[in-house]
Amino acid sequence: MTLCVGVIATTRRATLGTTKTRAVTAPGVIELGDESDDQVVWKRLGQQGVDKACELWSAVNSEAAAAAKGAWAGVKPAHKVFLSDILASPKRNAFVRKWIETDVTYASFIGVMHLGCLLAPFTFTWGAFKCFLAMYFITGCLGITLSYHRQLSHKSFRTPKWLEYTLAYCGALAVQGDPLEWASSHRHHHQHTDTPKDPHTPYEGFWWSHMGWLLDNEATIERVGDRSNAQELAAQPFYRFMEKTYMWHIAASAVALYAIGGLPWLIWGFCVRTVWVYHITWAVNSVSHCWGSQEFNTGDLSRNNWPIGILAFGEGWHNNHHAFEFSARHGLRWWQFDMTWMVICVLKFLRLADKVKLPKEAQMERMRFAPAGGASA
């Protein structure tokens, strides 16, 4: 969602029956207010599964569980994913349903990447390991967290177009989709966080939120198939080109790694790195919506999880992120390590980034949970 002066963007979240209004009062500054008379109406469907979800989640976030109760009306259930019943709504059996071509393609590629990792011990060299680390940073930090997430999805800072496109190309090499697809899907996630319309809602089960949503595109496309929320990206020829030629760039990167370093570089720089970045990224959607701490009252299940914060270059400070989606900085406290924010600071110092958006202290105080026994800020 594009943020600009004089524009008011309203997002509705079922939290204590209120609707939060986000108003842009200055470049990069958003004030939050409550419309106390505006109630969010939820219809009930699949009561048994919803009751189960509420019971299991009440210990970690009773407000969010209550908000989601009965929210499944009009949404087709996802297919059941192995070990998904940590927290789940009623599902259709995955083994008797028809797998569409996209499901087979995704499952096959992800499976081949994991099988390739079995060769890692037999192809290890220090050069291959250095290639892994370099590609981990290039695709994971520069590509996914810096470009796809903070710049393209949330517009938290601006760079020259040549740099924007270069960073987005790094994101494409992570094999998580083209820039348009990724940004659009992520905006749907924030619009419908932890509700049935969230593409990777934890209420469909831990494994669904981790990776199952990628393997059931019939259900996922119903939730994120509309790309109209990323029209400003679709209007740019570069992103349309990447959408049409995406897989060719993936294949070219694999060929290049093999040509430079042989099988060790292919296994470590492509297979191991891809699987590693996959699970780190997916853990933000799953682990950081299940385990960790909440500093801000976001009305959802987002958590600050420090191991994911480190491994995902700052993305694990997820409660902070859901409180201030526009913020270029996710680690809002000095001890919350956020490498992506450090990269943004370097770009800003080099005058390669501007319009960097950050929350004000007053905004953070307003969103914080009140101390035990204290009054709300």
Enumerate the language-model features and the residues they cover.
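Non-catalytic, topology-defining segments of multipass membrane proteins
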Residues: 2-282, 327-377
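Short alpha-helical linear motifs
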Residues: 158, 207, 290-296
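Active-site-proximal inter-transmembrane loops
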Residues: 230-237, 291-317, 321-324
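Alpha-helical transmembrane segments in multipass membrane proteins, preferentially the mid-helix core
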Residues: 283-287
